[in-house]
């Protein structure tokens, strides 16, 4: 083994020289220079400064404008709530621990930080699954008389939380565990050891199959069918121009969210899978730190994509920020929004 395993941690550094200390008790400056820990803290501060206002604004604008309370937007709001959980439950903790160079909150704090980070990421993933299924039903129409309504959206939101909790909660009750990872300032699932006492191997396999592979298969199936249907409908002109435009814009927004999710989370998942399948291999703390911290940007990019690509929401947001006045040049966006609002598709 090229790392050092303790009762509730695994440090990716050999203790042959006797320098390894518990990441819950002393700074880990033998893993990286102090300035590198400061860079992590600065990065987390940036995510907090960006993540809180933009997600809070998403919630506030939707509450202020009744026309935004559509079934599809329920799922998008669910993402904003999950992102706020990550900001308050995870980012603030990681900022503080990075400034100190070790996880000062102890094993219990590690459990909480790891739980919120995992919960937020899984809610985002399962929300994308629900959005993909919604797009598939609306555009491909496998059930001709089905209309995605408020009750379906609420069930979709509940489903995302149930599945996310099914992934994030087991390590809190003895199936696997949360431990500090990388430079030991943030916590995640234990991919580093088999730890038979907590059946770690079976949980990691369960997580990769049920909470990563299956969602990805569903998402790619839905969008594969969707792309084919959109091309076929465009060729046959089966829908009105307004409806086609609305469906394409909403679909484009959701596809971009999926791509952004993959860009942020695939490096983390790939490195975690490599470490798990190569137990005892030599890897440095930076190898897991960079993808783990990069994955946290998911709390920022979803609302940014939503605001940039959803004309109706953008107009409502600017109206809220400008104290009820529609800014000059947004009349066209407002008109477009009012047209697409009546479509079977959610506003875009």
Curated annotation (Swiss-Prot):
Motif 'Ionic lock' involved in activated form stabilization: residue span?
A: 134-136
Instruction: Classify the main location.
Output: membrane
Stretches the record annotates as Interaction with SAG:
330-348
Q: Name one GO cellular component term.
A: plasma membrane
Which residue intervals are topologically Cytoplasmic? Answer: 62-73, 134-152, 225-252, 309-348
Q: Which residues carry this modification: Phosphothreonine?
A: 336, 340, 342
**Subcellular location, in the record's words?**
Membrane; Cell projection, Cilium, Photoreceptor outer segment
Q: Could you tell me which CDD domains the record lists for this protein?
A: 7tmA_MWS_opsin
Name the domain of life this protein comes from. Eukaryota
- How does the record say this protein sits in the membrane? Multi-pass membrane protein
For the keyword Repeat, the answer is no
Lipid attachment locations (S-palmitoyl cysteine): 322-323
Residue spans, topological domain Extracellular: 1-36, 97-110, 174-202, 275-286
Q: Which GO terms describe its biological process?
A: absorption of visible light; G protein-coupled opsin signaling pathway; G protein-coupled receptor signaling pathway; visual perception
Question: Annotated site (Plays an important role in the conformation switch to the active conformation), which positions?
Answer: 113
Q: Name any one GO molecular function.
A: G protein-coupled photoreceptor activity
Q: What positions are modified (N-acetylmethionine)?
A: 1
Query: Glycosylated at which positions?
Result: 2, 15
PTM note says:
Phosphorylated on some or all of the serine and threonine residues present in the C-terminal region. Contains one covalently linked retinal chromophore. Upon light absorption, the covalently bound 11-cis-retinal is converted to all-trans-retinal. After hydrolysis of the Schiff base and release of the covalently bound all-trans-retinal, active rhodopsin is regenerated by binding of a fresh molecule of 11-cis-retinal.
InterPro entries (alphabetical): GPCR_opsins (IPR050125), GPCR_Rhodpsn (IPR000276), GPCR_Rhodpsn_7TM (IPR017452), Opsin (IPR001760), Retinal_BS (IPR027430), Rhodopsin (IPR000732), Rhodopsin_N (IPR019477)
**Is Protein biosynthesis tagged as a keyword?**
no
Which PANTHER family does the protein's record reference? OPSIN (PTHR24240)
Subunit arrangement?
Homodimer. May form a complex composed of RHO, GRK1 and RCVRN in a Ca(2+)-dependent manner; RCVRN prevents the interaction between GRK1 and RHO. Interacts with GRK1. Interacts (phosphorylated form) with SAG. Interacts with GNAT1. Interacts with GNAT3. SAG and G-proteins compete for a common binding site. Interacts with PRCD; the interaction promotes PRCD stability. Forms a complex with ASAP1 and ARF4. Forms a complex with ASAP1, RAB11A, Rabin8/RAB3IP, ARF4 and RAB11FIP3; the complex regulates Golgi-to-cilia rhodopsin/RHO transport in photoreceptors.
Q: What does this protein do?
A: Photoreceptor required for image-forming vision at low light intensity. Required for photoreceptor cell viability after birth. Light-induced isomerization of 11-cis to all-trans retinal triggers a conformational change that activates signaling via G-proteins. Subsequent receptor phosphorylation mediates displacement of the bound G-protein alpha subunit by the arrestin SAG and terminates signaling.
- Its protein name is Rhodopsin
Organism of origin is Caluromys philander
């Amino acid at each position: 083994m090229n790392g050092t395993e303790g009762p509730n941690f695994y440090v990716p550094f050999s203790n042959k020289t006797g320098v390894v200390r518990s990441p819950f008790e002393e700074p880990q400056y033998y893993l990286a220079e102090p300035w590198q820990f400061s860079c992590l803290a600065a990065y987390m501060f940036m995510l907090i400064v960006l993540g809180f206002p933009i997600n809070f604004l998403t919630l506030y604008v939707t509450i202020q404008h009744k026309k935004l309370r559509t079934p599809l937007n329920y799922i998008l709001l669910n993402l904003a709530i999950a992102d706020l959980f990550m900001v308050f439950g995870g980012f603030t903790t990681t900022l503080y621990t990075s400034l100190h160079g070790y996880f000062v909150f102890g094993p219990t704090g590690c459990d909480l930080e790891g739980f919120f980070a995992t919960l937020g990421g899984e809610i985002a993933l399962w929300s994308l699954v629900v959005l993909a299924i919604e797009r598939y039903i609306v555009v491909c129409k496998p059930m001709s008389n089905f209309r995605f309504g408020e009750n379906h959206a609420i069930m979709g939101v509940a489903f995302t939380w149930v599945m996310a909790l099914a992934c994030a909660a087991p390590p809190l009750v003895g199936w696997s565990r949360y431990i500090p990872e990388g430079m030991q300032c943030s916590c995640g699932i234990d991919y580093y050891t088999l730890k038979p006492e907590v059946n770690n191997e079976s949980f990691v396999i369960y997580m990769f199959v049920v909470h990563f592979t299956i969602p990805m298969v569903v998402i790619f199936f839905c969008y594969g069918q969707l792309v084919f249907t959109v091309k076929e409908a465009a060729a046959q002109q089966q829908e009105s121009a307004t409806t086609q435009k609305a469906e394409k814009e909403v679909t484009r927004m959701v596809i971009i969210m999926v791509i952004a999710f993959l860009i942020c989370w695939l490096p983390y998942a790939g490195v975690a899978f490599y470490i798990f399948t190569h137990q005892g291999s030599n890897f440095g703390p930076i190898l897991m730190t960079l993808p783990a911290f990069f994955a946290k940007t998911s709390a920022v990019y979803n609302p940014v994509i939503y605001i940039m690509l959803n004309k109706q929401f953008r107009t409502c947001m600017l109206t809220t920020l400008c104290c009820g006045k529609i800014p000059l040049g947004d009349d066209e966006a407002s008109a477009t929004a009012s047209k697409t609002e009546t479509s079977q598709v959610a506003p875009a």
